[in-house]
Amino acid sequence: MSNPHSQNLENLKNSEPTKSEPTQLNPIQSEPTKSLRIAIFTDVFLGIPGGIPSSIRAQKASLEALGHQVTIFCPGTPKDYMNPLTKFGANQDPSIIIVPTAKFLVNGAPFSKWTKYVTRFIEQKYPNLAETFDLFHIHYEATTSMAGLLLAKKYNIKIVQTMHGREDMAIAINVPHPFKTLAATGINLIHHATLKPITKKSPKPGHQNPEIKKSPDPDYQNAEIKNSLQPSHQNPALKNLAPTIARRQMWQMMVRQANLADQVITPSAHFAKKLQLFGVTRPISVISNGISDQEIANFTPRIRTYQDHEPLHILWFSRLSKEKRILPFLESLRIAQELEPNFRFIFTIIGDGNQMSKVRKFCRKHFDEASIKVLGTIPHQEILQKYTKDQHLSIINSYQFDTQGLTILEAAACNLPVIYADPDMSEIVPNHGGLCAKSPAPRAMAELLLKIYHQPELIQKLSQNLAASEKTYLQSHQIEKLLKLYRQLS
């Protein structure tokens, strides 16, 4: 039986990249209908690097370019958004509304106050919500997002809910035992109590909601996802996805949030399947988060080449956190050098996080200074333009956490091959432009690195595949699908 983690390298060598038509930026033609007034609710601080804030910023820009009105409700302070690293100043954009924000930080980022304070603030600022907005688009599951649900139900406004991430894994990875069980149970209880007034009005599992008949056509409905699943109580995969109380509690929270929406969006089919497996009954559409067209508007990526036994240039641009598994990848580099003393690399790290000190300590202990470049936080707009130039590979090392991995799409836009540990990410990598390790173990990634090191022609082949891929991951393509959903709900 073939290993689902592995990529057949012989097939890769013999394959021809799929050709695609040249992609124009902003190919959308405005529809001859009225512009929409969209309110986005998110608990994610938009000034930090990362897939969710990047996708929200790109979504806002694309919708506004088409003449739609977008208002974002999010946590933060004017001081936070004036940080030059963010280049996303709320003080300069009146359509970014900062909700009441707690004085403490959560994972280094601002977090909104209790939901009741957020709803009160919004109702005072917009006393006629139903006349101000056509629909709400919610991008998370915490206090501001719950405020969006409560207000939408109160004012009879349609809801689109994007489910971005595996909150069960975030708790499982980052919170130590036994506190993870307490934390997850507490979060789920608060979520349930806050939404209890509207939860009883939402459709129960198996209930035929008439809205489903009005939902997007089969191209966006992904009927094959529904048909491929057994009823949740019969499916043994549930035990694998939620083997602990903590993870089950977080799945309950995610499912509750999704089932209160009129339409659910996920960035990948594999995540959509998992949500339905756990009981999401609302229509789900798979729409990529997308990357901003402007990020690559003045950028001409080249085909990567790698010469025999030169240093392998590897780029990391993501959080330095446990769920992203930066330390296991550093261990892979150490093992690769141990297995092949002639293996040389230059590993560039862009990003920050709670594992920065451990990263620096590991690098000082095991690698020479020339092999590691720790750059910290770089303005997101500069990463693709300046820092991918001399790279051979991009790495995304998370496992069962990322639902899409925007890093993959950004690397693809640069024709930069991707190596990864999670076979679910194969769905995201365009046109066989990357390689997956045989397992998430550090040694498996080390073996993949050495395979590339000894077969340098793979870099050019992977890069050519990416160059020939259709650029459907651009926001200008994804926004067409999103607008179709909006139109059918509004």
What are these regions (language model features)?
Residues 270, 290:
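Carbohydrate-associated surface elements
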Residues 431-442, 451-456:
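Conserved acidic donor-binding segment of nucleotide-sugar-dependent glycosyltransferases
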Residues 185-203, 221, 229, 234-263:
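Membrane-proximal helix-turn-helix segments that form the acceptor-binding/catalytic region
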